[in-house]
Each structure stands twice: as structure tokens, then as C-alpha cells.
């Protein structure tokens, strides 16, 4: 079993049911000294940033779910890469698999993407100031390439 820290659309129970159906939620941890951003492909990533914190959902993945989630995140194609990073949940430090975008160049979100992220943040009761930060990103003009689809 692997712990996975989700900070974007993978926080959503519905999204995870599609891409890692056996994933089990463990809790709501924080990733310290990182910031949330939207990259040029219109989806989320995190990047090192002192004194900032990213909140998300910790999922327990089976080996099979890890493979299907890696395919969805386009690890083989190089869109994201995997890293093991420390997250803190209820005062406990745990290492978790985190997907980081290869490109850290900021851009506007894909149309509809931040709606999924914000709904998931509300579903998991992430801190309201953090949700407001996410909402501010959703106010940027969305990319018109195509609407976000997670199925």
C-alpha cells in the first residue's frame, strides 16, 4: 500500500473512483513549504515555496490503483513525475506519493477544472482561507483548449 497526497482534482471522491477505484481516504494532511499552482497544461501542481502550505487529501492506494493513477497522470509521457514528500496529518509526519508537474510555468486553469478542485476542498472541509486562495485562481480566465474531463 502507498499513501498518495492529492491536492488538485484527485481530492474528489468521484474522480478517484474513476482512476483509483480501490483508493481509501486516510485524512486531510498538509504539505508544508509548497504552494499550489496551475501550470501550462491547465491542471494543478505544487512547487517549493517557503512559509506556504498546500492542503489536500491522503489516499491509501493498492499497487493496482497506483498503476492506473500513474497512467491517468501521464507519468510515462512526462507530464508529471512522482516524488515521496513528507506531509503532516493530525501532528503525525508521513511520507506520501505526490505527483509534480514537469513544467512549473504558471498559466490559467482548464475550463471547469477549478470547479472540481474547489468542490472537493469543500467536501473535505479544508481550511476556509485556503479554499479562498483556490477560488481566487478560479477567477482567472480559463483556458479554452477543452473542458476538463475526468472520466
Predicted segments, located by residue:
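Glycine-aromatic micro-motifs
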Residues: 1-151
